[in-house]
């Protein structure tokens, strides 16, 4: 997520919505030509499986599901542009590549092949390699148990750092487009900041994999989104080692997407969103209705060991992709 403080400014929300619809592709849509080019893509170890042009065209576009663009307001009337989006399929492609490699490397057949090849070469029996390899019966490894080590692991870490930088550029590009089109400026009262989840934290103290969690180091500013009606919590991390220096990345769902669509109505959705300007409240986004998520009060009570809640910022505008 990316948080951009705007200060006490007046925003024409209808115009804001027009800009988002016109200049920010969303869901499965991307730009026809690149708005920005991320030069580090050429450094990916798995570059042959990446469509670089498509990845560059996706910079400055919003993902689907729970990804969003919001204008939020605090109790002092200060506005915030908040953008929740990630690596736009690039990360998925990279992860799928290394997952398949892990499954291959972890099969007994692959390990035995290496051992046999090295052994026969050392004994000067290279002519027997093909015969011996044909005798091996590979064993498949369940996806969840496959792993990588050595050079392949280093390549994976290297590529994931690039993907995470790409995701950051994507969010910043969307913010730049919106602010430039509307003539809005960043308030210096609070520095813009990113809060990232579902990523690998390559910190100096070691590697931490955070799934459904965000970094909450001592004194670190972060945002925890609740839902499209109640907004987000601006927090400061407590650096609690018992919580792995982390906090939850959001409220979490009370209902699955399927259950939300089955049990909630668009009328209910519309009623609870009546104080938020949004052209995204419809059947297509019903699974993102506020009622599908855990209540904010319960989350605030549960996260006291991880962060100090500094303020609640509430949406006055929300946009989600209609997938």
Question: Locations of the language-model features?
Answer:
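Domain-length cofactor-binding catalytic modules of enzymes
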Residues: 1-31, 40-323
């Amino acid at each position: 997520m990316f948080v951009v403080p705007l200060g006490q400014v007046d925003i024409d929300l209808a115009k804001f919505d027009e800009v988002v619809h016109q200049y920010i592709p969303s869901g499965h849509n991307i730009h026809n030509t690149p708005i920005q080019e991320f030069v580090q893509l050429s450094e990916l170890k798995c570059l042959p499986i990446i469509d670089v042009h498509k990845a560059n065209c996706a910079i400055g576009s919003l993902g689907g599901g729970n990804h969003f663009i919001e204008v939020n307001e605090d109790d002092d009337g200060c506005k915030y542009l908040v953008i929740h989006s990630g690596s736009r399929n690039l990360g998925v492609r990279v992860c799928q590549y290394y997952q398949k490699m892990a499954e291959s490397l972890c099969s007994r057949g692959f390990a035995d092949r290496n051992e046999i090849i090295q052994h026969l070469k050392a004994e000067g029996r290279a002519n027997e390699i093909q015969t011996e390899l044909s005798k091996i019966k590979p064993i498949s490894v369940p996806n969840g148990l496959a792993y990588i080590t050595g050079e392949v692991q280093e390549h994976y870490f290297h590529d994931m750092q690039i993907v995470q930088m790409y995701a950051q550029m994507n969010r910043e590009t969307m913010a730049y487009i919106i602010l430039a089109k509307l003539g809005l400026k960043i308030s210096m009262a609070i520095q813009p900041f990113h809060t990232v989840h579902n990523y690998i934290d390559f910190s100096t103290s070691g590697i931490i994999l955070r799934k459904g969690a965000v970094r909450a180091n001592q004194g670190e500013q972060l945002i925890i989104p609740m839902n499209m009606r109640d907004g987000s919590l601006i927090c400061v991390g407590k650096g609690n080692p018992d919580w792995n220096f982390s906090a939850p990345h959001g409220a979490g769902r009370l209902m699955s997407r399927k259950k939300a669509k089955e049990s909630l109505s668009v009328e209910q959705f519309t009623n609870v969103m009546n104080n938020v300007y949004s052209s995204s409240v419809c059947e297509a986004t019903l699974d993102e209705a506020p009622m599908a998520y855990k209540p904010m009060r319960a989350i605030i009570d549960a996260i006291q060991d991880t962060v100090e809640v500094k303020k609640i910022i509430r949406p006055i505008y929300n946009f989600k992709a209609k997938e």
